[in-house]
Amino acid sequence: MFDGLFDFLQNILLPIKWVIEQILVFFHTLLGFLGFGDKSGLSWALSIVGLVIVIRATLIPVFLKQIRAQRKMLEIAPEVRRIQEKYKGKRDVLSRQSMNQEMMEIYRVRGANPLSSCLPIVLQMPVFFGLYQVIESAQNAGTGVGPLNGPLGMDFRDSRIFGVVPLHDSFSHDFYALQAGQAFNLITMIVAGVLTAIMIAVQLFTQLKVIPKNIPENAKNTSVYKNQKVMLYLLPIMFLGMGFSFPVGILIYWTASNVWSGVQQAVAIYRNPSPGSLAFELRRKRLGVQNKKTKGQRQQPVNKRRAKRR
C-alpha cells in the first residue's frame, strides 16, 4: 500500500523535479561564466538561492492576495470576537452550529477567507519535496529526471561547500555518526546550525518587530492576533527540527526563502500598512498627512450684527 502511494507521489513530483533541475542548471551555468567551477559547492548553493528567487518572484501575486486576506481578517476580527462572546460557554451542538454559520456569513459578506493566508506556504511545499528528491537522487545515483544527468549530475553530487560540506549531508547524519564513534563532519554540523540560527532570527525579528506594527489596536485582543503569537513559539521549534533533520541544500532553500519573506513583509507593510496600525500612522507622518482631528480650521468671518451682539 505505502509503496504504491510513494510511487504515486514520485510520479506527481516528476514534472516539478524537472523544472527545479532546469532552474538549478541555468543558474549554475550562469555562475560558471562568472568564474565558479563546475564542482564548486558555492556555485550550487547560489543556484539554490536562485531557485528561491524564481519561485518567490512567481508567488508575488499570491503573496499580495495573502496580505489582503490577512487585512480582511484583522478588519472583521472585532465582529468575530463579538460572535464568540455571544456564544461563550455554550457547548451544545446547535449553538456551535449557529456560531459557525454567523462567522461564515461574515466571511462571505466581507470577502474574507481564513485559508488564503496559508497559500504561499502550501504552494511552496511541492517545490520543497521536489528539491528534496533532487538532492536525494543526486546523492544515491548522481542522476536526475532532467539536465542533472551524467557528468553534471555527478558534479552536483560531489560538490562541497567550503570544500568539505556536501549539499546532501545533514546535522543528524553526522550527529548519529558522532554518537556511534564513527567519522563525522563537524563543519556540516556548524553550517547546519548557522543556517538554522539565521532562520530562527529572521522569523523572530519579523514576528516581533515587523508584523506587530501592522496590527490595529482594536485587533490585538482577537484570536487572530493570539494565533500569530502562538506561531511565534511554534515556528522556531519547527525550524530546530528542520535544522537537525534536513540536508544542507534544503536548509539553504528555507533560509533564503525565510529572508525573502521577512524583507517582503517589511516592504509591504512600509508601503501599504493596515489602517489604524502604528505602521499606518508612521506612513502618514512620512507623507506629511495631518490627522483630521488635529488639523486647524479656517476661522469664519463675523458679520457686523453678530459682532454687536457679542
UniProtKB/Swiss-Prot annotation:
Transmembrane segments: 16-36, 44-64, 115-135, 186-206, 232-252
Locations listed in the record: Cell membrane
Region spans: Disordered: 290-310
Family: Belongs to the OXA1/ALB3/YidC family. Type 1 subfamily.
Protein name: Membrane protein insertase YidC
Its membrane topology: Multi-pass membrane protein
InterPro entries: YidC/ALB3/OXA1/COX18 (IPR001708), YidC/Oxa/ALB_C (IPR028055), YidC_ALB_C (IPR047196)
Subunit note: Interacts with the Sec translocase complex via SecD. Specifically interacts with transmembrane segments of nascent integral membrane proteins during membrane integration.
GO CC annotations, alphabetized: plasma membrane
Keyword Protein transport: yes
Origin species: Tropheryma whipplei (strain TW08/27)
Functional description taken from the UniProt entry: Required for the insertion and/or proper folding and/or complex formation of integral membrane proteins into the membrane. Involved in integration of membrane proteins that insert both dependently and independently of the Sec translocase complex, as well as at least some lipoproteins. Aids folding of multispanning membrane proteins.
Gene Ontology terms: biological process: protein insertion into membrane; protein transport
Predominant location: membrane
Keywords: Cell membrane, Chaperone, Membrane, Protein transport, Transmembrane, Transmembrane helix, Transport
Molecular function via GO: membrane insertase activity
Any Pfam family hit: 60KD_IMP
